[in-house]
Amino acid sequence: GICYDVYMSHTYKPDLLWMEPFETILEPLEELYTSAEPDAFEIFLGGAEKTYAPTVEQKKLRSSLKSNLPESRYVHNIVPDPQNTLQHFYDEALPGNSVAQIQNVAELRRVRDVNINTEFYGKIEINKDIAAPEKLHMDASIRTAAIPISNTPLLDAVMASAKRNFNPPDIQQQNDPWAFARYLVDRFVDWAFVPNFRDTIAKSYKKDPISFNVTDYIEWKATRDGAYKSALEAECPEDMVELNLEKYDTMVKKRIKPKLTVAAQYELAQPQVIVSMSKHDTAPFTSIFRQIFRRFESALRPEVKSAGMASDTDISDWLTDFKHVIDAYSAIEIDAGKFDKSQNLLARMMESLLMQELGLDPGVSEIFEDSYVGRVSSRSLGLMFISAYQMKSGAPQTMLGNIIYNFISAMEAVGPGNIALMIAKGDDNILWLKPGANVDSAVNKMSSLFNLEIKLIPNSVLYFSSGYIVPVGDVYHFVPDVLKAVELLGEKGADPRTLPERFVSFSDRVRSITRDAAIPHVLQRIMRSRLGISDLDVVGAVDALACMAADFDTFKRVVA
């Protein structure tokens, strides 16, 4: 049933010390989604029931080390002015990134630059300036490099888009990429999955494969908010389901990622053309790929960790379970980018083959392959380029596809026999290598076989998925990057209606930083070492973040 008009002044969270009350601010909703009628997809899938084989789950035991160690949460100091404290911290960590008046810089460059956020209708001529209306914005409360709009010269926009989107399969030096994909997937399954996976679990998966069904769709839809459901139904007029997988919309990405080094702040922004899918085209596939993702993570042996659906606590528990390996072996980060937008035919083949190993109905893959991008034309940049089998933005298998490509490329480049332990999420990973492992050829293999430009970062402070691995006694904690948390607070142009959701996400991030009393001080030493700043006040920044996480009004005042 559904219960309305229930408001709580506070709730209790079992992970807080001594079950202290956690104050929650509940904003009244302007419009409550109350539709109890089945939508077009429920009607369309109504005759398709959930008949596939159940997912085999591994029994996961809590870390013996962590279960015996009582946690004492960090008690933060009161910071009268969190905004000023965080601004000072950011300026100390990345000097020069936030001190410039951004709108004045944009004014100086306006004559020779093109505002890529404006649609141009007409002929773009070489060596001619294009006048475009530009709305100057005021500085954010906390000035960081996370500015959502930017001016970029047309030539740089063209080159950035071409570099990101152009990757013909023959670059990967394979005459038969399908056979190469089959070889890589077979090798990965034998190395990364639980022993005898093909002879036991895989047989039941393939016997009763996962296909379209109304049960998984309703389960997925229940996790969406009212605004998303309303938008989804609006795309299906008169309850008609019509998939246009070959259709796409193009736009130039507005938010330019911040530059994390002093030298890089003077580089030109790197925009890209976003080729996106509509909500109703992804809806029937998302619920299926969620189940495949669960099977993928359950099939991995304990030494190979996918953090795609893992919380900070889950990652911390896994790190603690393998503390003996982490302490004994050397680690490397493989820093590679452009997984989803530049990888195409080989990546799509590998994910398709691996999904079939996990029990995806081949008929689903045959339908979904129409969603991949072929020829793209951008009205914004006056471009047309070909990118065979590129993944669209918003594709339902984006995270799973990235993790699959991440695992397989790292395994093949480094060698499965050299890897003692590995964790991956998106395009981030850390590998702990066995003694005597030689990874000198890894960079060349990544480039020639997988079209990835990588950097090997050995024996440094471990940084993974915007977080640090922090040792505290006999426990390893995965702690979000304080600098990244501050950076996101300075983002300008966010929808004010999302402020409550941003506060909840922000509070969860801060709770991971303060889950143990020793974390802020150890994290301070780690960040000082990685950033090369001996007097960076990380503890003071944590105190300021904790003050904001404890009070919604303070959070709202800083980010508004």
List where the protein language model places each region.
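Viral RNA-dependent RNA polymerase
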Residues: 1-560
